[in-house]
């Protein structure tokens, strides 16, 4: 018996997010500039931050350009064929591995049309393969492995190519979204909050919910899911490893702080890959359209902003010692335990409420059929997993200490300076503390991101559950931090 397609769902009222079109414009065109600023201002030429920025009375733009390594041919020097071809090759390799390596197929959540999309998951295999190749090259050639030296020498140009890529893919999916027709056999849908009618805002927030493309020899690729966990997350680990290699080329050693940050961030990423199917129930997949917001975040923001600490340490090494390492690992363990335990509890309850590990939990039965947990981890706060996620971010930044350094010319003979292999000397001097604006940015940003996500989720749940959600909020009063927020 044929299944009747659902009628078009009633349009849910959604206001603008991110301050509407002005916010969309600012994020889309100023965040890329901010990434450039971070990576120019904190550099391996003059210091972190560049010395001119600490001397406002004698500030000179020409001097600043020299200190940060601004290309001699200006903006044109921000791009290169080498950097662009590297980005193309990297993404083509990701697509090939996506197709040829073993994978599992999982159905996504039910769409408003009543259908379900199928997803092909093998990110763990493809990423492990890539890392194994890089590890083999490093074992054979050490820190001089061409991948590591190429990334250091073409760092800004690779960044530029990825920024351009994020703009191109955002524009492609936006234009293509106008071919979505109700009742189509491919289960294509528009995102509820992504077709406001404002071109800039819809391009930014994402007009189509799950844009897919058929690629010759590769097959169908879900663009949003593919970019969520593959090139950017993998790039984050690769970027960290390249800065560890740079530290070794600079000094002949790799500090415990660099190893710690690289290892714990890799653990975080591997956890995402290991639990790849769990992405199907996240807001990114079920609710948000795919536009510039997610494209830029996946392709550029994650690998280039999240690796700022290891880049800093490649120039100014910091040794934590046994006690420092123990403290950082303790924070990581606490955050990871909260994050994973809470998510596992929720997933077990959704899958099998009679599971002995969760059958004792109390809940509110909503009119929509869903159950809202009011005890256990989710009785402590509405997003206790966000607290664990945020705690995990602290050891990413804390190892940089009172960050900031100045790079002096060879032969300065400054007491206590770190001396690079090329003779240049690195001291903190008057830059001490100012570098924290860059190396601790992640903690601040991630906290704001999680608060914003919680607010968005709260609004979505209130629209979905109505008075049941209001009752739930009376029982579980805290949003993220139990008793505080």
UniProtKB/Swiss-Prot annotation:
Q: Which reaction does it catalyse?
A: 4,4-dimethyl-5alpha-cholesta-8,24-dien-3beta-ol + NADP(+) = 4,4-dimethyl-5alpha-cholesta-8,14,24-trien-3beta-ol + NADPH + H(+)
Describe its membrane topology. Multi-pass membrane protein
Identify the EC number(s). 1.3.1.70
A Pfam entry, by short name: ERG4_ERG24
Q: What main location does UniProt list?
A: endoplasmic reticulum
| Alphabetized InterPro entries for the sequence | ERG24_DHCR-like, Sterol_reductase_CS
Molecular function per GO: Delta14-sterol reductase activity
Subcellular location(s) per record: Endoplasmic reticulum membrane
Annotated pathway: Steroid metabolism; ergosterol biosynthesis
Gene Ontology terms describing biological process: ergosterol biosynthetic process
Glycosites: 240
Span-the-membrane segments of this chain are 18-38, 77-97, 131-151, 155-175, 259-279, 285-305, 319-339, 431-451
Q: Mind listing the UniProt keywords for this protein, alphabetically?
A: Endoplasmic reticulum, Glycoprotein, Lipid biosynthesis, Lipid metabolism, Membrane, Oxidoreductase, Steroid biosynthesis, Steroid metabolism, Sterol biosynthesis, Sterol metabolism, Transmembrane, Transmembrane helix
Q: What else is known?
A: In Fusarium, the biosynthesis pathway of the sterol precursors leading to the prevalent sterol ergosterol differs from yeast. The ringsystem of lanosterol in S.cerevisiae is firstly demethylised in three enzymatic steps leading to the intermediate zymosterol and secondly a methyl group is added to zymosterol by the sterol 24-C-methyltransferase to form fecosterol. In Fusarium, lanosterol is firstly transmethylated by the sterol 24-C-methyltransferase leading to the intermediate eburicol and secondly demethylated in three steps to form fecosterol.
Task performed by this protein = Delta(14)-sterol reductase; part of the third module of ergosterol biosynthesis pathway that includes the late steps of the pathway. Catalyzes the reduction of the C14=C15 double bond within 4,4,24-trimethyl ergosta-8,14,24(28)-trienolto produce 4,4-dimethylfecosterol. The third module or late pathway involves the ergosterol synthesis itself through consecutive reactions that mainly occur in the endoplasmic reticulum (ER) membrane. Firstly, the squalene synthase ERG9 catalyzes the condensation of 2 farnesyl pyrophosphate moieties to form squalene, which is the precursor of all steroids.
Q: Which family does it belong to?
A: Belongs to the ERG4/ERG24 family.
Its protein name is: Delta(14)-sterol reductase ERG24A
């Amino acid at each position: 018996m044929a299944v009747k397609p659902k009628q078009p769902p009633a349009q849910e009222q959604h206001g603008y997010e991110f301050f509407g079109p002005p916010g969309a414009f600012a994020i889309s065109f100023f965040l890329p500039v901010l990434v450039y600023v971070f990576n120019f201002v904190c550099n391996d030429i003059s210091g972190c931050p560049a010395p001119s920025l600490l001397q406002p009375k004698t500030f000179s733009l020409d001097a600043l350009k020299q200190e940060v390594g601004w290309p001699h041919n200006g903006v044109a020097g921000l791009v290169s064929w080498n950097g662009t071809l590297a980005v193309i090759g990297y993404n083509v390799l990701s697509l090939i591995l996506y197709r040829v390596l073993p994978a599992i197929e999982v159905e996504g959540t039910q769409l408003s049309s009543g259908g379900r999309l199928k997803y092909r998951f093998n990110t763990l295999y493809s990423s492990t393969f890539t890392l194994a190749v890089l590890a083999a090259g490093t074992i054979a050639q050490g820190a001089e492995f061409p991948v590591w030296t190429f990334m250091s020498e073409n760092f800004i140009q690779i960044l530029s190519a990825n920024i351009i890529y994020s703009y191109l893919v955002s524009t492609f999916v936006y234009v293509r979204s106008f071919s979505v027709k109700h009742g189509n056999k491919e289960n294509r849908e528009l995102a509820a909050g992504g077709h406001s009618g404002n071109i800039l805002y819809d391009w930014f927030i994402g007009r189509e919910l799950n844009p897919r493309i058929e690629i010759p020899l590769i097959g169908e690729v879900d663009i949003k899911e593919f970019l969520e966990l593959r090139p950017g997350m993998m790039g984050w680990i690769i970027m960290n490893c390249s800065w560890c290699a740079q530290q070794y080329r600079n000094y002949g050693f790799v500090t415990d702080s660099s190893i710690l940050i690289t290892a714990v961030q890799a653990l975080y990423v591997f956890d995402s890959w290991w639990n790849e199917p769990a992405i199907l129930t996240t807001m990114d997949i079920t609710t948000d359209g795919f536009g510039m917001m997610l494209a830029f975040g996946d392709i550029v923001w994650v690998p280039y902003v999240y690796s700022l600490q290891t880049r800093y340490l490649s120039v100014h090494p910091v040794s934590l010692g046994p006690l420092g390492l123990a403290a950082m690992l303790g924070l990581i363990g606490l955050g990871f335990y909260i994050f994973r335990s809470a998510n596992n509890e929720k997933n077990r309850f959704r899958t099998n409420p009679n599971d002995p590990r969760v059958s004792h939990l109390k809940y509110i039965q909503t009119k929509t059929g869903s159950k809202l947990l009011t005890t256990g981890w989710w009785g402590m706060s509405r997003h206790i997993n966000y607290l664990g996620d945020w705690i995990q971010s602290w050891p990413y930044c804390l190892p940089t200490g009172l960050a900031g350094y100045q790079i002096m010319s060879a032969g300065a003979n400054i007491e206590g300076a770190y001396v690079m292999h090329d003779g240049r000397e690195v001291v903190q001097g008057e830059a001490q503390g100012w570098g924290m604006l860059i190396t601790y940015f992640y903690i601040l940003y991630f906290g704001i991101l999680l608060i914003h996500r919680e607010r968005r989720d709260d609004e979505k749940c209130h629209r979905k559950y109505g008075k049941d959600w209001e009752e739930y909020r009376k029982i579980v009063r805290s949003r993220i931090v139990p008793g505080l927020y």
